[in-house]
Amino acid sequence: MGKLIRMGTQERRLLRPKRLHWSRLLFFLGMLIIGSTYQHLRRPQNPPSMWTKVSSQQPIKLAIRDLPNDEITVTDKDPPEASSEVEGEMLAPQDTVIIGEAAPSIAMEDTPNPPITTKITPTSLKNNYSPTTAGTRRQKENIPPTPSRAPSHFISTSGRQRVKSYTPKPRGGRKSSSPTHTREEGRMHTPSPAGAPRTISPTSTEKDSETTATYRMLEPRSERTAGKTSLKRMVPNTRTFLTREVETDLVTSPSLVGKNTLGSPRRGERNSSTTPLRAVLQPTPATSEEQVTASIRMGSTPATTEGSTAAQRIGNPLSGTSTPAVRIASVTDREKRPSTAHGTLVTPQVKAVLTTQVHRCVVVKPAPAVPMTPSPSMTAILFPEAPTSGPSALPPGWPNLHPKAEYPPDLFSVEDRRQGWVVLHIFGMTYVFVALAIVCDEYFVPALGVITDKLQISEDVAGATFMAAGGSAPELFTSLIGVFISHSNVGIGTIVGSAVFNILFVIGTCALFSREILNLTWWPLFRDVSFYILDLSMLIVFFLDSLIAWWESLLLLLAYALYVFTMKWNKQIERWVKEQLSRRPVAKVMALGDLSKPSDGAIEENEQQDNKKLKLPSVLTRGSSSASLHNSIIRSTIYHLMLHSLDPLGEARPSKDKQESLNQEARVLPQTKAESSSDEEEPAELPAVTVTPAPAPEDKGDQEEDPGCQEDVDEAEHRGDMTGEEGERETEAEGKKDEEGETEAERKEDGQEEETETKGKEKQEGETESEGKDEQEGETEAEGKEADHEGETEAEGKEVEHEGETEAEGTEDEQEGETEAEGKEVEQEGETEAEGKEVEHEVETEAERKETNHEGETEAEGKEADHEGETEAEGNVEHQGETEAEGKVEHEGETEAGEKDEHEGQSETQADDTEVKDGEGEAEANAEDQCETAQGEKGADGGGGSDGGDSEEEEDEEDEEEEEEEEEEEEEEESEEPLSLEWPESRQKQAIYLFLLPIVFPLWLTIPDVRRQEARKFFVITFLGSIIWIAMFSYLMVWWAHQVGETIGISEEIMGLTILAAGTSIPDLITSVIVARKGLGDMAVSSSVGSNIFDITVGLPVPWLLFSLINALQPIPVSSNGLFCAIVLLFLMLLFVIFSIASCKWRMNKILGFTMFLLYFVFLVISVMLEDRIISCPVSV
C-alpha cells in the first residue's frame, strides 16, 4: 500500500497509486493466463463420456417387467428374446435346448461373440413396467457402459451362444433363425404385448446387446459356467460405468440397479435396499453366474422338468428379473430378493417354468432422459417392498439425479490418495479454514460495518443481520455448494454440526478456560434461546417428510425477519419483560435476585460484583446482539492474532489475581462501549458513573426495593444509550445538572470553585460521558472497576466514594455519607474532612494505583483495544496504563472524581443490597433516601465550591485528558489500520507471515480495504469481492473434504458434521475464549446462539428457496440416514445446556464446561453411527 512514516504521534501514509495500479493489473493478467492454460491442459484429460454416458444410461428402464406373465408363457417356439434381453429356455423345451446349441450358430450370425442365450421365461416380467419397456427392460440397463459392448461381453465360451445383439428388430430376425428364438417368439407373440417388447419400443435399450442365454435344460450347470464367464467379463466392463450410475439410479430408476446387479444380482438386491450403487459395483462373476442361471417355474409342465435344473442354476423366482437377470438392477435385486421377499413376486410373474441363464445382459438403452423422470414412479413399482429403505431411499434418489458431484478431476487417483497423497488435501482444507477467517475478519466484516453506517442501521439490528452474516458466511456458502454443486447434504451437515459445536464445544471451552466462574445475564440468553428453539422446532417439522417445499423455506426466512424485528425493539421488550417480572411479589423477585448471592456475610461484595458483571456484558453488547463477537472492533482478527499475538490467551491475563482478572472485564467493557458510543466519547473516558446499575436478573431485588431510584435508573440507562446525559440526570442528577452547569460557569468565572468544577465537571463528564458512555461505557468501566475494586478495596472504594462525597459535600455529606456509608463512611469522612483535599489525592493515588492500573489501562484499552483488537489493546494498555498512571495523576484526579461518583453509585447499590438483605421496607426507604442523598451529594459536590483549591491542577488534568483523547483517537486509527504487509521482526512471526502470504497478498491486491479512509467509498466492491473470495474458498473446502472423505470412506454428510463444522467455527471459538477469559461470558454465549439462529434461518432456507425457484417450485429432498436424528439431538442438547445453566444459577463452572465438552464428542459419535447405519434412528420419519 505504501510506507508508513511515523511523524510525531501521527502516521502519514505515502501511497504509490501508479505502481499499485500496474501491480494489480499484472496480477489479474497472470491469473487469467494461468487459469486459461490450466483449463486448456485439463480438457483433453476429462472424458465427457463418463458423466454423459451415465446420464444417458440412467434413463434405461426395465421393459420386461411390464409384460404380463401370460405373455411370458413360454412355448417351445418361444425365443428368449421375448424378454428382448435374454433368451430363456423352458425346461419343457429341452428339445429347444438342443436347438439352443444349434442356435449358437444363429446367434453367431448376429453377433460374432455370442454369449450363451437363455430363454427369458421371465421375459414378460409381471413387474408393472409397460410391456414395451418390459422387452427392453433390464438387459438394456445391463449394458450401461456401452450398448455395443454388450455383444462383446457375450462369451462364446458357452458353446450354445445365442448372442443376440438384437436391435429390437434384428432380434426378431435372429429369433426366427434359431429354434430357440422361435420359442421365444411364440411366447412373446402369444401375448401381443410380448411381441411388442421384442420390437421393444424400449427396444432401443435392448438393441445394442441382447441377453444371450443358452437354455440348456439338460446342461444347466455348464451353462452356468458359461454364464459366469460372460457375466464376469460383463461385470468388470459395467462396473466402471455403472458404479456411480447404478447408485444414483437405484433410487431413481431401477434400471441402473439392474446394471449393477449384472455384476452380482444378489449383492444388487442387498444394495438396492441400502445402496444399489455399491452393490452393482460389487457384483462378482460367481454371483452373476447364479443370477444368470435362473430357473423360473411359471407353470408350464415342461418347465417343471427343467425347473429342477433351473433351480440348480439359480432359481431366480422373478420371471421378469431372471430374463434380465444380470443387468437389471431392480430386476436382479428382485431376483435374489425374490428368494427372500421378492420371490413371491417373481414366482407369480413367471407362468412357464423356464431356466434362464443370462450369461450377460448387455442391452444398453441409449435411453432418453425420459426414464429418469419416471424413475421415481418406476422405483415405487419395482420396489413395492423396497420401501424398507425408507426415507433414505429418497435422498439417494435425488443425488442420483446428479450421480457425480460436479467437481473438477483430481490430480491424484483414489489409489494415489490412499498411498498418502491425501495429506495434501487435508493440508489444503486446513489452510482454507484460515483463509476464510481472514477474508471474513479483514474485509467482509469491515465492509458490513460501513454498510450499516451508510444505512444508519441500529447496532442491534446490524448485529443480528450483517454482522451475523459476516461470521456465518462460510456456512452459508457451504450450504449453497451442497445444494447446487455437490448435490449432497453437506451443507445441512455443516450447519447442524456447527450449531452443536457452538452450543456445546464453544460454551464448554469458554467455561473451562475462563479464569473465573462465568456469570450470565438471563435476558439475552433467554431471548436468543427462545428464537432458536422456535426455529429448530420448525426445522424438525419440515424435515419429517424428507422434502422441503418452497413455502417452508419462506417460513424459516420469516422467522429470521421476526428475530431482526425483535432485535430492533430489544430494549423496549426487555424493559417491558422486566417490568412485568418486577410486579411480582417481592419474594419472587428477591429469589431471582438472590441467585448470585452466596450468603449474608459476603453479600455486599459478591452481589455487587455479580450484578455488575451480569449487567455489564449486556450493556456492553448493547442488548447482547448476536453481532457482539463479529464486531470488527472487539474481535481480534486471526491475522492479528497470528502475527501480533502468539499467545492471545496469555496476553489476556495481566496477572493471576482475581482483581486484575476483573480488571480485564472492565477493560473489554469500555472497549465495546467505546465502539457503540464513539460519538458520545467526550473529553476522556472517565470511569465516573453515577448511575446505579440497571437491574440484571439478580438486581431485581434492588430494583424492586428502590423503585424510585433503580427503576428510574434502569430507564435512564436504556435511554442513556440514546439520550446521554438526560437519562441519568433525570433520575439521579437532576439537581446535579443545574449545579453542574452552574459549576462549569462558575469555574470559568470563579477560581474558587475549580475543584467543585472538577467534581461538577467530572460529574458532568462523569455523567455526560458516564451517561453517554457511562451507560454504555462509563457504567461498564465503573461497574467493572467497582467489581474490580469491590473485591479488594470495598473499604477503600467506600472511602473513595465517601471521601469524594464528604469532601465535595462538606458537612452535609457527612450526614448523608453516614446514612449511606453507615459505619465506614463516618470514619472515612473524618479522614476526608481532616485530610481535606489531600485525602482526595491520596484517594487519587489509591485510585491511581488501582484505577490507573485499571482505569488507565481501561481507558487506554477503552479506545485502543476496541479497535486494535484485544491483544494489541493489552499490549498498548501497559504503556498507556503506566504513562497515565505515572504522568497523569491529574487525569486520575478526574478518574478519582469519577470513581467517587462511581463509588457513590456503588455505595448506593451496596447500601441498597445490604438494606435489601436487612429488610424490604427499610430497603425501600433507604433506597429512596440514598437516591435523594446521591442527588444531594452530587449537588453538593457540584455546588460546594469551597473545595476548589486545585483548580489549576484540574485544568491541567483537562488538558492532559484532551491530549490523551487525541492519542487514543490516533491509537484507534492505528487499531483500525488496514491490512499491513510489513515484514515482521521476530523469526517466528516471519514464518507465520510467509505462511499466510499466499492468502493475504491476493486479497490485498484484489479487494480495497475499507479501513483506509480513501478506500471507504469502495465498500460495495469490498463487499462483493469478499463474497466471491468466500465462495471460492468454501468451494475448495467442500471439494477437498469430499476427496478426503472419498479416500477414507466417509460420506460428505459426516465430513460436514465433524471437520467442516469445526473448521468454519474455529475463528469464533478463539474469539469466544478470549472474551470469556476477560469475564464476558454473556458475549460468548449470546454470540454462539445468535450465529446459530442465522445459520438455521438463513443458511439453510436460502439455498433451498433458490433451488425451488429454479426448478419450478419443486420441493428439494433433504433426508439423510442420520441427519434428522442429528437435528433432534441438537434440540435436546440445547435444552440440556439451558437447564444446566439455569440450575447452576446462571453461572458456568468448570464442571459444567467439562460435561458439555464431553457431550459434544458423544454427539459426534452418535451422529456418525447414525449416518453409517450402525445404529438406527429411534425418531425416524
UniProtKB/Swiss-Prot annotation:
GO CC terms: cell surface; plasma membrane
Glycan-carrying positions: 271
Membrane-spanning segments: 420-440, 465-485, 492-512, 520-544, 553-569, 990-1010, 1018-1038, 1054-1074, 1093-1113, 1122-1142, 1151-1171
Sequence repeats: 730-741, 742-754, 755-766, 767-778, 779-791, 792-804, 805-817, 818-830, 831-843, 844-856, 857-869, 870-881, 882-893, 894-905
Keywords from the named record: Antiport, Calcium, Calcium transport, Cell membrane, Glycoprotein, Ion transport, Membrane, Phosphoprotein, Repeat, Sensory transduction, Signal, Symport, Transmembrane, Transmembrane helix, Transport, Vision
Segments of this protein annotated with the region 14 X approximate tandem repeats: 730-905
Compositionally biased region (Polar residues): 124-136, 301-311
Principal location listed in the UniProt entry: membrane
Protein's name according to its UniProt entry: Sodium/potassium/calcium exchanger 1
Organism placement in taxonomy: Eukaryota, Metazoa, Chordata, Craniata, Vertebrata
